[in-house]
């Protein structure tokens, strides 16, 4: 409030020049500027933001020495504005001028003032020389001079002292004569150093070796501490056969090798020829011991094999994998194919009711399953040794892979069959299998599992597909048959791949049995024909036709209208949604009433019967 009162008392022409223009002032930003701004503006003056030419520079007298130290400009004290406002008249600004410029002063005046550069006295030079005399190598660095400044050797800065020494005092220090002080030398001690002690010990050992041929036993005891302990492999190895009297044991040979290594390092050159002569003997002994160990390992493996064969006599007939792999594969494949065709034809002659049943399980079975059943087929085909081979656990494990199954099936036979050729042996096996099949069918005709296909598959099987099916199944069977020849006893039913199409058609016509499932399949065929006809009439795909049937609740006429003319909500009514179907199947009475009010009772019953039909 006081500042506003003062500003109101100031005349508006206080800071106008004789021409009637407002005076311009410049003050550095700060509290002083905030104080003077209302006074200058109320008096008619202007306060510039930047320093402009012709503007009066105002400055606080307390800040004049710090701000305008090196400038020669003319500054007016802020007291000028305050005095003009107090007296309410324009005063002369030159009376308040503050001129701070570079002034020329003498050395003596600077010394009296206590500021500026001072000269060096003789005492200061002597102190510098005395301090730097012992540190001449560090004189060109900075650390020594900084330390002198810390210790206050002189009142000058460390840069000044360094400059003084390098320019004026360094020559004086070089001209000074240096006095050599007598250095006290320590008396020489003739005690032996640890390195010399080692050399003396080595020389003494060499001399002892040269003088007398020491026995190998004490050397082995000395080097025993250096040698590493025996490996666990040596400790766990089985006991070897007794060696000859002239040959040392393996442990002694190893020790002798360790001894030779130590002697080569420690003994002088005169001992080297003798050691080189002993080295071949040790190596020969070591190689002979290795050969003996291999022989013992072989004998142990043969003994273990013989013991296994004694425990499992059937395993003797199983050959090695290398012998099995060398046998020809193509002949084996041909024999397997002929065996399967002959056995199937004989079965079909005996049981004609099973000809029309397609064997889809054999098509969908994996190669691994066919490999597992192939092992059982050889055992059922009349080979007694094959039956015994499955009881052997080692034989079953060996037959896990497809290659091993082929080896065991082809080569696990009697000694008489080995003499015969492959084709003759296969024919003999087929005869035995036919005999076994006849006996088994007469005793237990119901034991053979018959895999009946689903009704949907039977109904969808048209004559064209029945003709194509044997060809595709035959190709698939030829691919899987060489790897895994399956027996007829283990298969779910006879495959239609081998049966001709004429047999299929004739047997299917002569052996038709009327069952509820077959009637259902007939209904399914009729529905299928109707859907195909609807697709032809409307020229729509199966997806569109199926959607229309779902909308029409299975009504073919309404579905045809939907496909041809489209759906109209006003004429056809609301459509059933998935949520409506779920509520209908839930059979909640309250929700059923809502559905009946929405669709009508007839439509609800029709939809319910449509959703309840289970077509397989």
UniProtKB/Swiss-Prot annotation:
Any one GO biological process: regulation of DNA-templated transcription
Basic and acidic residues biased stretches: 271-288, 344-358, 468-480
Biased composition (Polar residues): 246-255, 363-382, 397-415
Pfam family, one: BRCT_2
Acidic residues: bias regions: 431-444
Swiss-Prot/TrEMBL keywords: Activator, Chromosome, Nucleus, Telomere, Transcription, Transcription regulation
MF terms in GO: telomeric DNA binding
Renumbered residue ranges of the record's region Disordered: 174-518
Family: Belongs to the RAP1 family.
Protein name: Telomeric repeat-binding factor 2-interacting protein 1
Organism (species): Danio rerio (Zebrafish)
């Amino acid at each position: 409030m006081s500042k506003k009162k003062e500003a109101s008392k100031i005349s508006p022409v206080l800071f106008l020049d004789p021409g009637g223009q407002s005076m311009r002032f410049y003050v550095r930003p700060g509290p002083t500027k905030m104080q003077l701004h209302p006074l200058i503006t109320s008096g008619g003056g202007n306060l510039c933001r930047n320093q402009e030419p012709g503007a009066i520079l105002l400055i606080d007298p307390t800040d004049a020495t710090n701000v305008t130290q090196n400038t020669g400009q003319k500054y007016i004290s802020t007291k000028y504005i305050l005095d003009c406002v107090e007296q309410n008249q324009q005063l002369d600004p030159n009376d308040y001028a503050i001129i701070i410029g570079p002034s020329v002063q003498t050395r003596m005046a600077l010394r009296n003032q206590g500021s500026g550069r001072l000269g060096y006295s003789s005492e200061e030079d002597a102190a510098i020389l005395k301090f730097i005399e012992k540190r001449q190598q560090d004189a060109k660095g900075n650390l020594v001079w900084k330390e002198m400044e810390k210790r206050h050797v002189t009142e000058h800065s460390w840069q000044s002292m360094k400059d003084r020494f390098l320019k004026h005092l360094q020559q004086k220090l070089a001209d000074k004569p240096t006095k050599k002080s007598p250095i006290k030398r320590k008396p020489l001690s003739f005690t032996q150093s640890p390195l010399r002690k080692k050399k003396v010990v080595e020389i003494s050992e060499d001399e002892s070796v040269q003088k007398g041929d020491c026995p190998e036993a004490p050397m082995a005891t000395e080097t025993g501490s250096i040698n590493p302990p025996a490996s666990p492999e040596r400790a766990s190895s089985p006991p070897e056969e007794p060696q000859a009297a002239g040959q040392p044991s393996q442990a002694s040979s190893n020790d002798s090798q360790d001894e030779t290594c130590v002697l080569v390092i420690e003994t002088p050159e005169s001992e080297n020829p003798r050691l080189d002569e002993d080295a071949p003997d040790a190596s020969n002994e070591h190689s002979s011991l290795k050969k003996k160990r291999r022989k013992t390992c072989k004998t142990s493996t043969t003994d273990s094999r013989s013991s296994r064969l004694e425990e499992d006599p059937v395993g003797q007939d199983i050959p090695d994998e290398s012998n099995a792999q060398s046998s020809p594969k193509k002949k084996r494949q041909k024999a397997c194919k002929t065996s399967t065709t002959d056995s199937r034809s004989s079965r079909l002659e005996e049981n004609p009711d099973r000809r029309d049943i397609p064997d889809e399980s054999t098509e969908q079975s994996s190669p691994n399953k066919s490999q597992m059943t192939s092992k059982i087929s050889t055992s059922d085909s009349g080979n007694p040794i094959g039956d015994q081979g499955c009881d052997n656990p080692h034989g079953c494990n060996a037959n896990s892979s497809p290659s091993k199954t082929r080896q065991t099936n082809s080569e696990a036979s009697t000694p008489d069959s080995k003499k015969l050729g492959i084709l003759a042996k296969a024919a003999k096996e087929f005869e035995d299998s036919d005999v076994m099949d006849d006996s088994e069918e007469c005793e237990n005709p119901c034991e053979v599992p018959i895999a009946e296909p689903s009704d949907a598959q039977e109904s969808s099987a048209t004559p064209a597909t029945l003709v194509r099916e044997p060809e595709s199944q035959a190709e698939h069977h030829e691919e899987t048959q060489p790897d895994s020849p399956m027996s007829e006893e283990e298969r779910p039913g006879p495959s239609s791949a081998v049966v001709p199409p004429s047999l299929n058609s004739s047997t299917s016509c002569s052996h038709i049995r009327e069952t509820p499932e077959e009637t259902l399949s007939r209904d399914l065929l009729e529905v299928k024909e109707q859907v195909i006809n609807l697709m032809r009439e409307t020229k729509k795909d199966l997806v569109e036709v199926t959607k229309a049937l779902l909308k029409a609740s299975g009504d073919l006429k309404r579905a045809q209208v939907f496909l041809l003319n489209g759906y109209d909500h006003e004429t056809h009514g609301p459509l059933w949604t998935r949520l409506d179907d779920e509520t209908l199947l839930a059979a909640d009475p309250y929700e059923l009433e809502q559905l009946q009010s929405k669709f009508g009772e007839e439509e609800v019953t029709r939809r319910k019967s449509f959703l309840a039909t289970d077509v397989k």
